[in-house]
Amino acid sequence: MSKSALCIGINDYPGTDSDLAGCVNDASDWSALLAQRGYGVRQMFDSEATKATMVQAIGDLIGAARNGDSVVITYSGHGTWAPDTSGDEPDGRDEGLCPYDIGDGNVLLDDELTEIFRLREAGVRVLLIADSCHSGSVTRGDDADLDPGMPRARFLPPSVWADDTQLAPASLSRNGGFGSFSRLGGDLLMAGCRDTEFSWDTRFGGRPNGAFTYYALKTLQQLGPDASYQDWFRAIGNHLPTTRLPQTPQILGSRSARHFPIFE
């Protein structure tokens, strides 16, 4: 059995005035953890992560995997939405990831990722971890780890990268989400928040990180070796949402996939 991972972190968004701070650290942290778990890891940071290179790298990873192999893709950066042109979205919007060159209009839509994921061979396990996007509000959890003066939302409004003609079919009143990512064809999606919420870019002990990534890694260290993804998700829920980090992590996938051992 082969285990492979791609960890993407984008802080720098030229032409948008919407740079982030914690995404490269997120990707580095996921990379270190996955390497410890026996994964061969490729990293893509900032200018390395254009739409073309992301599509190529994800396609190569999925295409090389065989029955029994495990694939993990982590993405930390901005999320966004674009008007749905295929009619498969009830809310009229396709969700998307924001590559480094999003300022040139190069959004990576969920429909495009779906086509890549459909190429996977039977028996390949795929996990997507997305620390990006959304908006919303709820109060509970523990803020003790969070530095003062933070955080910043990981959502890039379509008006930043698309012109009026591209946006005309959909309303600008709502923020982007990743609910449709549950249809990508992977076994599991672990996301930083609900479709109606933001994921937050913040700082812990002076070091920038995504809130979801920080607490996901923190809680994983406290779980036993036989813990499942469902166990992990419940542990993360003890920390998020909070008053200052109003994001509700999500896990999407089949019952059996939720009970897979973590990163096995």
Sequence positions of predicted segments:
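Cysteine endopeptidase catalytic domains of the caspase/legumain-like
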Residues: 1-264
